Amino acid sequence: SPLGGIPAKNGVLPYAAAAAAYLLLALALYYQLVFLPMTLSAPDSLVPLASSIALDRLREASGQYPLWQPWTFAGMPTVEAFSYLGGLYYPNIVFSRLPFGDIGSQILHLCFAGLGGYALLRSFRLHHAAAFLGGAAFMLNPYMTAMLVHGHGSQLMTAAYMPWVLWGTLRVFHHAKLADAGMLAILLGFQLQRAHVQIAWYTWLLMGLLALVLLVSAHRTVKESLKRAGFFATACMVGIAISAAVYLPASEYAAYSVRGAAGGGGAAMEYATMWSMHPVELLTFLVPGLYGFGGVTYWGFMPFTDFPHYAGIVVLLLAFAGFVARRSEPFVLFLGGSTLLALLIAFGAFQSAWADSV
């Protein structure tokens, strides 16, 4: 079983080669942003950029982290409102000293996402080429490119941690070592610091389901199971603690935000499900232009969208073939079940339409 033999140590060279190859792929795809004097002009990129530039200058001049910015909505907090969090994301200590700016940081996170997919697949002893292609499929998913292009960098960078979190969870449950729990805690903490709560929530949902599958399918003694569950729970708590500087202030401010002030203590259901995917629009996974390519050409069920949710025919065919071939393995069953759960969540307000069609 692939779940039974995850190697504790792997050679560094294959991972270095994979990382270099992913970097070359990213540079080939986004060369205009890296090598040419071009930038992205999406409103979601330009609007926050203006205040970020001013806050960066204020931080540099004062030597203190700005906690208030007066330019938006007659003034609003920076940390509590998630409007200026770059300084609380620990990896930015390194990225801020590199000469390629925010776009370069996002591209490096794309490479990190691909390497995470590679590491996850190699942990199941897949061939290097197969693992590399799997990581590339995740890294080059059109959704990731759309997040980069349309100014949702935090969403992209938070999603980059998803395969790494699953990889770390597997290691904790198979090796039950403190070092693995520490690595998972760091991954979880950094992902939460990147502060796209929705993507982090999806990641934790998948991680929890995987942990449950690993506990049930392993047939270990109660003592061994409790040991692994303890390491896992500790990693989760430490991960939350790492990101506390972001979420403690935000939790105090939430009641005053637009979403938190809605009835019931959170965003109204109608508002929260405005961008639900109608079951019929799943066809765009195969034919991206079926409901238009976004913008003024879009005529689907969402209020508007800037891009189709294309997954790729080849990727989907390979995923289906892999599921059929290895459907008896716990991790494959986890992937199949989590895919169905993800679709049900995506349907949102249209779940009744899905139920009626069934």
Predicted regions and their residues:
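Start-transfer (signal-anchor) and selected internal transmembrane alpha helices
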Residues: 1-31, 227-232, 236
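Residue-level signature of transmembrane alpha-helical entry/exit and packing/kink sites
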Residues: 11-19, 106, 131, 155, ...
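Membrane-embedded helix bundles of polyisoprenyl
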Residues: 22-25, 111-124, 128-217, 231-251
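Membrane-interface coil-to-helix junctions
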Residues: 25-117, 136-160, 267-313, 345-358
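Structural signal for the C-terminal ends of transmembrane alpha-helices
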Residues: 30-32, 168-174, 211-221, 320-329
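Transmembrane helix-loop junctions in multipass membrane proteins, especially transporters and channels
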Residues: 34-38, 175, 196, 215-223, ...
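Transmembrane-lumen/periplasm boundary regions of multi-pass, lipid-linked membrane glycan transferases
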Residues: 55-56, 237-266
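Membrane-interface helix-loop-helix junctions at transmembrane boundaries of multi-pass membrane enzymes
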Residues: 218-230, 304, 308, 318-353
